[in-house]
A protein has these predicted regions:
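Basic/aromatic-rich interaction segments and small domains that mediate binding to polyanionic partners
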Residues: 2-63
Length: 63
């Protein structure tokens, strides 16, 4: 599933995100969503979330 639509993302699901420090390389990190930080319904680079381990990144793929 696509990580650009907020309606696809709910707390507790497993996702792949790109962290701020990994934006240049595109390295993806797997984690479980704790909070959704983006307020808009759509974001072209992915919805920003906080993972349960407190890392913040933009959702690239939903597992």
């Amino acid at each position: 599933m696509d990580g650009r639509n907020r309606s696809n993302i709910v707390p507790g699901i497993e996702v792949y995100v790109v962290l701020k420090e990994d934006q240049r390389t595109g390295k993806q990190t797997k984690g479980i969503v704790k909070d959704i930080l983006t307020r808009s319904a759509y974001h072209p680079w992915g919805i920003k979330v906080r993972l349960e381990d407190r890392q913040i990144g933009r959702v690239q793929k939903i597992c």
